[in-house]
């Protein structure tokens, strides 16, 4: 199913944090703790702004939303927060 990509991305990012390879996301998460966190938060802010700016064009909105979701998942993986915690929160809000 299409929604499985969220877990696949999360699992890949956790693996890249624990077993760094030569990739942008691995390097981002392997920086010194404070520097890595600051860079991830900066990227999240940038992507959130881009989603807002792209909201008048559906194609741009889809692209920028994917970026924001990716970096949100990256932040969760970096902080060691299980994806199921987010799913549980969404379920509790839906009920």
UniProtKB/Swiss-Prot annotation:
GO terms for molecular function: ATP binding; phosphoribosyl-ATP diphosphatase activity. Pathway: Amino-acid biosynthesis; L-histidine biosynthesis; L-histidine from 5-phospho-alpha-D-ribose 1-diphosphate: step 2/9. Keywords: Amino-acid biosynthesis, ATP-binding, Cytoplasm, Histidine biosynthesis, Hydrolase, Nucleotide-binding. It is an enzyme of class 3 (hydrolase). It is found in: Cytoplasm. One of its GO terms (biological process) is L-histidine biosynthetic process. It comes from the Archaea. Its EC number is 3.6.1.31. CDD domains: NTP-PPase_HisIE_like. GO terms for cellular component: cytoplasm. It catalyses: 1-(5-phospho-beta-D-ribosyl)-ATP + H2O = 1-(5-phospho-beta-D-ribosyl)-5'-AMP + diphosphate + H(+). Transmembrane segments: none annotated. InterPro entries: HisE (IPR008179), PRib-ATP_PPHydrolase-like (IPR021130). Belongs to the PRA-PH family. NCBIfam families: histidine_hisI. This is Phosphoribosyl-ATP pyrophosphatase. The gene is hisE.
């Amino acid at each position: 199913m299409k929604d499985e990509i969220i877990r696949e991305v999360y699992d890949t990012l956790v693996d890249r944090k624990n077993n760094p390879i030569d990739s942008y996301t691995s390097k981002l998460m392997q920086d010194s703790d404070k520097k890595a966190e600051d860079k991830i938060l900066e990227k999240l802010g940038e992507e959130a702004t881009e989603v807002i700016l792209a909201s008048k064009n559906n194609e741009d909105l889809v692209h920028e939303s994917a970026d924001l979701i990716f970096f949100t998942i990256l932040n969760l993986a970096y902080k060691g927060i299980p994806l199921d915690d987010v799913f549980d929160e969404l379920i509790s809000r839906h009920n």
